[in-house]
């Protein structure tokens, strides 16, 4: 039982004993005591006034006397207006530190056989181009959210839906047939996703040229500019061929399907490299080429049950006007599906594969309305988690102007960004002398850890709902609210512990109850103890930024302590041992906290 749990239980017993009434746990509000007052935790008395029928100060005195007399964790108390400030006994702090020291995952809840199953969808790439900066934010948020939900005692399934069909894929395929001369990732020396992305760009280039030529021709024939452009886009031989290829794909044409599979396989190999470099992955991958058929079938079942309706043109719709929304198209008049149909199909396949209790979609905020509708439709179709599905909505991420422009000058490839971050981390680390006495292999590994840590932390520390500007230079600063600052602090702690070991100092598993503790050491234990609450809150709010903020606050607290107090040069052996145990647990908590963000920490720097 934690110190907070002990106090809550004793406070509930106090109200029962003193005022003869049972109160729920949520009525007992504990908060950290403000720095200008004596104490460690403060009990808010106001919720009990209707029960005590006394003044706030008198109620606080009653509760304070009872809690001090009945809880070994409390050394003393004082009352400030309606607030009861509790001074935690030094032995209780040492006991808490021992508890932390004995638990490698202190602050996290274990996953059990009966834990609820949470499925998290993220990434959702198209197979006609490489992953870009927007995908980076999506993948980092999804991966971190999965770690946080697991740390809150949930079983987690990480999933990806790949948009592997449609006109955009056919454009890349057609361009490769026309202009590729049999080029492959091996012959070109390019990753498969980059190669296919180049052919998507090539299609667009040739298509624009065709439209320009046709538009000029139609205008010369007397057509106005707007009508000429519209007709040119429709009559372009390239776009017609792409649509013909899509029809053949849907008809299972063997040649088209073989080409589609070959080119998609190149892309998947490229994606896998990017995911590996980014340190993310999935437990189950779904493909739109499978799910859209399931979605069509599910919509037709809903139609037969009267959940949806068919219009005169044969299209199928859902009427959501009773929910304050509009009518939603589910199948076009020619029977082809829309994105909503595919999402219904994907949901059906997942529901059949896993006993899902909660479904979280990590998708940009431009899709807010889509998921509002999907939630209603899934609920009507009988998915138990439909009504409660979570759309983890996030904002756009951009780079400062002139930073890392891509070949098209608009979108930054994830691979280019990762390589640039690792390169910048290596250069900055060399300039700051962080690579002293390291081999080239060790330098490259530290650069990888720091570069990716800088990228991930800078993105994840921002509230996901907000648009953000990612500044590569700011992210690699070894001071301030950055990944490298936290990583360097962890490496410093590991260095201290190695020096202690070299001096023959053994860090004990348990501290005796009479070991010395000063106020600053108690503050550090209290900050360590807040990790569990930070993990729980991050799980409730779906907020990786809450974990990032906690790691930064703990890092600042340790660095201030280390500035004020020597660890290995402490005045007494007992002080040295206590501080080494403290440092060890700060390091462990930083490592665990950063792992929830998908960030590695280096053992040395």
Label each PLM-derived region with a short phrase.
Residues 1-94, 112-605:
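Non-catalytic interaction-recognition regions
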Residues 95-100:
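Short, charged, solvent-exposed linker or helix-capping segments at domain edges/interfaces
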Residues 102-113:
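Flexible, low-complexity linker/hinge segments
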């Amino acid at each position: 039982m934690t110190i907070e749990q002990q106090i809550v239980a004793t406070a509930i017993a106090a109200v029962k004993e003193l005022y003869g009434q049972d109160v729920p746990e949520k009525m007992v509000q504990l908060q950290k005591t403000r720095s200008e007052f004596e104490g460690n935790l403060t009990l808010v008395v106001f919720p009990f006034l209707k029960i005590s029928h006394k003044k706030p100060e008198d109620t606080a005195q009653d509760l304070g006397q009872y809690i001090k007399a009945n809880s070994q964790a409390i050394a003393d108390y004082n009352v400030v207006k309606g607030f009861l400030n509790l001074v935690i006994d030094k032995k209780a702090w040492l006991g808490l530190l021992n508890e932390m020291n004995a638990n490698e995952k202190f602050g996290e809840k274990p996953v059990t056989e009966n834990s609820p199953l949470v499925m998290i969808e993220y990434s959702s790439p198209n197979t006609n181009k490489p992953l870009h900066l927007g995908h980076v934010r999506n993948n980092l948020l999804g991966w971190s959210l999965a770690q946080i939900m697991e740390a809150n005692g949930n079983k987690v399934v990480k999933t990806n839906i790949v948009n592997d069909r449609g006109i955009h894929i056919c454009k890349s395929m057609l361009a490769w047939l026309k202009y590729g001369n049999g080029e492959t990732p091996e012959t070109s020396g390019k990753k498969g996703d980059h190669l296919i992305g180049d052919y998507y760009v090539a299609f667009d280039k040739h298509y624009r040229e065709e439209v320009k030529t046709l538009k000029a021709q139609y205008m010369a024939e007397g057509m106005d500019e707007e009508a000429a452009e519209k007709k040119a886009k429709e009559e372009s031989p390239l776009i017609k061929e792409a649509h013909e290829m899509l029809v053949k794909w849907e008809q299972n044409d063997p040649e088209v399907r073989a080409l589609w599979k070959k080119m998609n396989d190149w892309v998947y190999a490229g994606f896998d490299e990017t995911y590996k470099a980014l340190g993310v992955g999935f437990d189950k991958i779904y493909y739109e080429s499978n799910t859209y058929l399931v979605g069509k079938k599910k919509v037709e079942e809903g139609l037969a049950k009267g959940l949806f309706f068919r219009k005169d043109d044969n299209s199928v719709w859902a009427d959501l006007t009773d929910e304050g929304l509009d009518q939603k198209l589910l199948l076009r008049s020619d029977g082809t599906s829309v994105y909503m149909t595919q999402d219904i199909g994907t949901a059906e396949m997942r529901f059949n594969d896993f006993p899902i209790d909660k479904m979280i979609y990590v998708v940009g905020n431009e899709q807010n309305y889509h998921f509002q509708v999907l939630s209603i439709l899934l609920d009507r179709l009988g998915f138990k988690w439909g009504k409660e599905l979570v759309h983890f909505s996030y904002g756009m991420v951009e780079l400062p102007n002139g930073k890392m422009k891509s070949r098209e000058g608009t979108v930054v490839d994830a691979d280019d960004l990762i390589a640039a971050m690792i390169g910048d981390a290596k250069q900055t680390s060399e300039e700051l002398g962080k690579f002293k006495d390291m081999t080239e292999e060790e330098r490259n590994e530290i650069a990888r850890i720091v570069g990716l840590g800088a990228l991930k932390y800078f993105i994840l520390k921002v509230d996901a709902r907000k648009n953000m500007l990612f500044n590569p230079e700011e992210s690699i600063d070894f001071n301030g609210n950055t990944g490298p600052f936290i990583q360097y602090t962890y490496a410093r702690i590991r260095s201290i512990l190695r020096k202690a070991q070299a001096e023959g100092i053994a860090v004990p598993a348990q501290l005796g109850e009479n070991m010395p503790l000063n106020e600053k050491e108690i503050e550090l234990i209290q900050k360590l103890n807040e990790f569990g609450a930070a993990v729980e809150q991050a799980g409730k709010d779906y907020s990786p930024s809450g974990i990032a903020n906690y790691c930064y606050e703990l890092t600042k607290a340790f660095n201030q302590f280390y500035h004020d107090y020597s660890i290995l040069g402490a005045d007494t052996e007992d002080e040295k041992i206590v501080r080494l145990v403290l440092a060890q647990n700060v390091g462990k908590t930083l490592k665990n906290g950063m792992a929830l963000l998908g960030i590695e920490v280096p053992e040395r720097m």
